[in-house]
Amino acid sequence: MPRRKQSHPQPVKCEGVKVDTEDSLDEGPGALVLESDLLLGQDLEFEEEEEEEEGDGNSDQLMGFERDSEGDSLGARPGLPYGLSDDESGGGRALSAESEVEEPARGPGEARGERPGPACQLCGGPTGEGPCCGAGGPGGGPLLPPRLLYSCRLCTFVSHYSSHLKRHMQTHSGEKPFRCGRCPYASAQLVNLTRHTRTHTGEKPYRCPHCPFACSSLGNLRRHQRTHAGPPTPPCPTCGFRCCTPRPARPPSPTEQEGAVPRRPEDALLLPDLSLHVPPGGASFLPDCGQLRGEGEGLCGTGSEPLPELLFPWTCRGCGQELEEGEGSRLGAAMCGRCMRGEAGGGASGGPQGPSDKGFACSLCPFATHYPNHLARHMKTHSGEKPFRCARCPYASAHLDNLKRHQRVHTGEKPYKCPLCPYACGNLANLKRHGRIHSGDKPFRCSLCNYSCNQSMNLKRHMLRHTGEKPFRCATCAYTTGHWDNYKRHQKVHGHGGAGGPGLSASEGWAPPHSPPSVLSSRGPPALGTAGSRAVHTDSS
């Protein structure tokens, strides 16, 4: 029965085969010794099946070799798959039948029975042994290869991904392929359009787990959650900036725990310095409001008295968050509902610590914030600057959000609907105020009497009875009042129809001389009709 061929045959003895010095095959006992046959890496197999078929008793035939009775050379015979001359075969190592083939040298890990580790992607050798990943760092540790960076030629934008750079270049080219189907809004990125559509639907998918706060942007939620993180950090000794809360310490990576892995020094040169450097002397990049810090001359006019603090705070004085229309206030300080509950509970809620903890404060009112862009936006309220104007009417505002809210008056859009009745409106604050009718809640209480109401404007108007302030003064006669509705009714006596001040049209944004004109006019000029007067009354509060 024929034997199965071996996958890795060992050198064997072949009786009856002898190789003489003339490279001819003669029959005779002895060992098989061929200088050109048994080279390292060649597998020789006996074809015993063919021997049985031919009936030869001598094992004279090898795989690829045929016996030549005439004594021809092996290198010139066509039976060889490729010929080897004496010169070519001399480069190999001659083996005898008794010699053993030496195995290639193994690494220290293979000698212990371990598998070799992954090869280095740069040099192909074992990881940690090549010149690219060998000991060359300051501490003798391996050096990590630098990552490929894609940088913008027009600005300092840098990214590790080419797709991010392509998306960023649309910012410079002005291309805005994503357009809103309800308004003229267009954006270069789909994520911005998705965020914008929530302004039409009123959707607020991001909710704070610690309080009822909800918003439509993840960035606003993260900024809000800093108010729950704890006490603020110490102020900067150079510019006085104070962060809202310290960032939590990043846990060290496993590589850092075992030992610091230094990067190449030239890697740090690939990334530009994107940190904000504020020069000494404060926030000089904010709008210059030097003309507002005078002695009341210029815009306010000589002899004008300051407006009572009850009328013009539009932001929470506890956390700096901008208050919506109809949101609560207290005597002498407007505050949001969360800060009011925090003060009622003795400040144990972990909320903001007050205006003293803010890095940027307004010099004209108690407004303070952690962010310089919020202060710059707030200063437009005092300066009277209104860069956002309506294309359908003379309305103008200092804030883009107010303009968007105003445009719903023209379009008739009412995205906010009451779940208990058919009421719908275009302003979220109006929906909240309407919801108090169903709940019967009256969160606005007077600290001097038992008066309470469900709208902040009613509380502000009520507080004028205690203070005796009458900010609305007629320029034609000596009439003064504390209510805008009464003032409009009085203007009909002079034939102005309540649309504006004496001799001024509604588009000029009249403000009573008893108060700084920039404050009352910053929320939009009076408009014709009942809707316009209601909007002015809300803004003046």
UniProtKB/Swiss-Prot annotation:
UniProt biased composition (Acidic residues) = 44-57
Any one Pfam family here would be zf-C2H2
**Superkingdom:** Eukaryota
Alphabetically, the GO molecular function entries are: DNA binding; transcription cis-regulatory region binding; zinc ion binding
Q: Which cysteines does the record link by disulfide bonds?
A: none
ZnF (C2H2-type) intervals: 150-172, 178-200, 206-228, 360-382, 388-410, 416-438, 444-466, 472-494
Q: Which residues carry this modification: Phosphoserine?
A: 85, 96
**Where does this one sit in the cell?**
Nucleus
Residue ranges under compositional bias (Basic and acidic residues)? 103-115
SUPFAM superfamilies found in the cross-reference section: beta-beta-alpha zinc fingers
Note the InterPro entries from the entry. Znf_C2H2_sf, Znf_C2H2_type
GO BP, one annotated term = positive regulation of transcription by RNA polymerase II
Where does the entry say this protein is expressed, by tissue? In the retina, expressed in the outer and inner nuclear layers, and the ganglion cell layer.
Its biological purpose is as follows:
Transcriptional regulator that plays a role in retinal development and maintenance.
Tell me, how does this one assemble? Binds DNA. Can associate with the proximal promoter regions of PAX6 and SP4, and their known targets including ARR3, RHO, OPN1MW2 and OPN1SW.
This chain belongs to the protein called: Zinc finger protein 513
Q: Which organism is it from?
A: Homo sapiens (Human)
